[in-house]
Amino acid sequence: MRRTQMNLTNETFSKALDDNKVLIVDFWADWCGPCLKVAPILDEIANEYNVTFAKVHVDEEQDLAYKYDVSTIPTLLVFENGLPVKRVVGAQPKHKLVKEFEGWI
């Protein structure tokens, strides 16, 4: 099991995709209540499964949010081999997120 939580910027995003076969990216903001609610759940999943999570603060990295069509937060994007393959929008309980991520965790 590995637990990695990276804060990504426009400058570090591509390298993170290149360095991880599967990367789950949490697009969030510190003023977003549902984002704060889901954060500890993502920490639990990262600790229990073989998955790397990263965070993108949408206020600070608006270009990335725009590029990946993130208009609602939290939005979780699963990237596989550098490509977005799954989108989960909104805070969800742990068991639902685990089910959404099946095949990647």
Question: PLM features: residue spans?
Answer:
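N-terminal "domain-start" segment that seeds a small globular fold
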Residues: 1-18
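N-terminal targeting signals for export/organelle localization
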Residues: 1-3, 44, 98-99
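Structural signal for short hydrophobic segments within the conserved structured cores
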Residues: 4-6, 54, 85-88
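Thiol-based oxidoreductase modules, predominantly thioredoxin-like and allied folds used
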Residues: 8, 27, 39-63, 70
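Hydrophobic heptad-repeat coiled-coil signature
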Residues: 32-35
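Non-catalytic, surface beta->alpha helical segment in thiol-disulfide oxidoreductase systems
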Residues: 80-105
